[in-house]
Amino acid sequence: MIISKVWVGSLALLAVVSMPLQAASPVTVGSKIDTEGALLGNIILQVLESHGVKTVNKVQLGTTPVVRGAITSGELDIYPEYTGNGAFFFKDENDPAWKNASAGYEKVKKLDAEKNKLVWLTPAPANNTWTIAVRQDVAQKNKLESLADLGRYLKEGGTFKLAASAEFIERADALPAFEKAYDFKLNQNQLLSLAGGDTAVTIKAAAQQTSGVNAAMAYGTDGPVAALGLQTLSDPKGVQPIYAPAPVVRESVLKDYPQMGEWLQPVFASLDEKKTLQQLNASIAVEGLDAKKSRSRLPEAKRMG
């Protein structure tokens, strides 16, 4: 799918319609080190700056533990996080709430506010969780849209070979959980185990049909999925936790900028899983576009808050 028209001159427009704020301290914006972290962190930076907020750029600060530690210690003021990670932050992995988008969001929002004085703003309607992606030609020919469809296809004897990491193949909450929920079982001849956990490698293997592979371990919003001709399968039974990205801001900072939630809400609301977020990730991971420039490919200027 072609990305919607690049909005041009929207920052200039926003500069006119947005009143600069005369607030105390600059807002320190951080993110995780991965592609999507860079993208979302830069989007937050852009929205705040378009409303006259002075910022400090700490995008791509580090891994989840590093960034999480930075915001709880006050080193960061705002960063994008995933709702499902609340299960691990608060050691509550068995609560079924994490497998429901709204329940998981409300739970992590409540816990973080109470324990850390962190406020979760409106999340994007996307899910960056473990999934299986199949080649689009296979998906279209066999009407594969969900993991339930995959279970049906495999029972019918459909040709299938999955590229995945050993962790995905072996972890009880990964492939085995999908097999149990959707009533299928892959044998060794249907699996290609690749070293590490890099989905870029598994997706590339499926795109190039390496060793007969036509499917790959992936994350729901992986950029290369659509760009390399693959399609993610939905998880209608909610086997995996929902990992919806959302801005997380320190309570004291939100008091200084009470409109921050209103500014960011329409932007994150526009980041739907397949039409926008995958394509924006692809513009970085596949096209090599700088994350700062990829921000400008958001669908419409009016969505910039």
Q: What would you call each of these model-derived segments?
A:
Residues 156-235:
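Ligand-binding pocket segment of bilobal, Venus flytrap-like solute-binding proteins
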Residues 36, 167-181, 258-305:
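An extracytoplasmic/periplasmic, membrane-proximal ligand-sensing/linker region
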Residues 102-161, 269-271:
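A conserved helix-loop-strand patch within extracytoplasmic ligand-binding domains
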Residues 60-64, 74-87, 104, 165, ...:
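Beta->alpha turn/N-cap motifs
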Residues 90-100, 105-121, 185, 210-212, ...:
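Ligand-binding "clamshell"
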Residues 26-44, 59-63, 167-170:
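Extracytoplasmic "Venus flytrap"
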Residues 130-140, 243-258:
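A bilobed periplasmic-binding-protein/Venus flytrap-type ligand-binding module shared by bacterial periplasmic
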Residues 35-54, 176, 180-182:
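Short, polar/charged alpha-helical segment
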